[in-house]
């Protein structure tokens, strides 16, 4: 689905969302009449420092705002230009992610919706930083592609390709990401999205459950147990 189709299905009665220069911003009415803030990246646009600080600013603009946030993502990776790197790209991306963490901690639901491509730091700082991540069929997320992993780890690409067949954490793609627990659910584009969004918002926020989801789905069998053990040891040490 394209962003125009998604917005039409989310807000059948109309919305105040605009898409300019790859940036999505505005708001739309939920089925109960309240409003949801809509932000994001469109058209496979790379996420640079100007975009990251602008998105964070939209989230932080009004400290009294309690609208939930929907982050629509169809991006390239982060913009790895000289200017962005020299000005501290990683800090800008971290600031955007932490803006969402803050919103979630203050009672604003943050929902990431993957509908196109996204990769690397752009993915981590936007949709993956949301409290809940959902997707539409055809989304193409990748934290790092296998050739890049090969360059970093010095492992042969053939070896990584074999590992990816059995270990979802090594493999890009929506199905693998869902197996690890990162994606809560994949929405059905044949049904109105406004109802699926309403159902999600009706569920109480349950904190970060990605490790337990990954264990249940077989994509990350150890993460939940290790996290629990670390927690128990920390408590024991006072």
Each model region followed by its residue ranges:
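Conserved catalytic cores of soluble enzyme domains
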Residues: 81-188, 195
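A structural preference for short, pocket-lining loop segments at secondary-structure junctions
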Residues: 34-40, 54-82
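Short, solvent-exposed amphipathic alpha-helical segments in soluble enzyme
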Residues: 55-56, 128-130, 201-203
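STAS-typified acidic loop motif
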Residues: 26-52
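Amphipathic alpha-helical segments at domain termini/boundaries
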Residues: 1-15, 152, 157-238
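Short strand->helix junction
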Residues: 44-45, 78, 117
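N-terminal short beta-loop-beta anion/metal-coordinating cradle
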Residues: 14-32
